[in-house]
Amino acid sequence: MVEKEISGRFSIRFATPNDIPIILQLIKELAKYENLLHMVVADEKLLDEWLFQKKVVEVIIGEMNNTVVGFSLFFYNFSTFLGKPGIYIEDVYVKKEYRHQGYGKGFFRFIAQLARERGCGRMEWSVLDWN
């Protein structure tokens, strides 16, 4: 699964190194939304290292009519009880002007399908209690 059209002109694709500036911008927008912008120390070099050199985490980008509407960042964990890996979703962020239109659900569906395809035993995430 490299790219998937979710509905109409909304598609989700895996990020590439060319996306690093937009990923960082989206991370900062998310942090601002959560009133945590002061805590962001990530920069383009760190994102390149961990996303594309060491491949510890993955990012997917959602686009509507070739315009970025949001992103999700996730990584593997492992369940000793299941004896299988799982996927932990660290972030799902949809830009303000695109919220409440189903794009967030699209990210979750994409990752759930990916988890099934990769033989994962579960998919997990947590949400701030005020969100």
What are these regions (language model features)?
Residues 49-61:
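A short helix-loop-beta-strand connector motif used in the catalytic cores of GNAT acetyltransferases and
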Residues 98, 102-110:
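Conserved acetyl-CoA pyrophosphate-binding loop and the N-cap/start of the following alpha-helix
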Residues 116-127:
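Conserved GNAT acetyl-CoA-binding A-motif
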Residues 24-49:
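Conserved GNAT-fold acetyl-CoA-binding loop/helix
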Residues 61, 67-75:
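Conserved beta-strand in the GNAT
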Residues 84-96:
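Conserved acetyl-CoA binding element of GNAT-fold acetyltransferases
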Residues 95-97, 101, 129-130:
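Active-site acidic-Proline motif in GNAT/NAT acetyltransferases
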Residues 11-23:
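A short beta-loop-alpha structural element at the N-terminal edge
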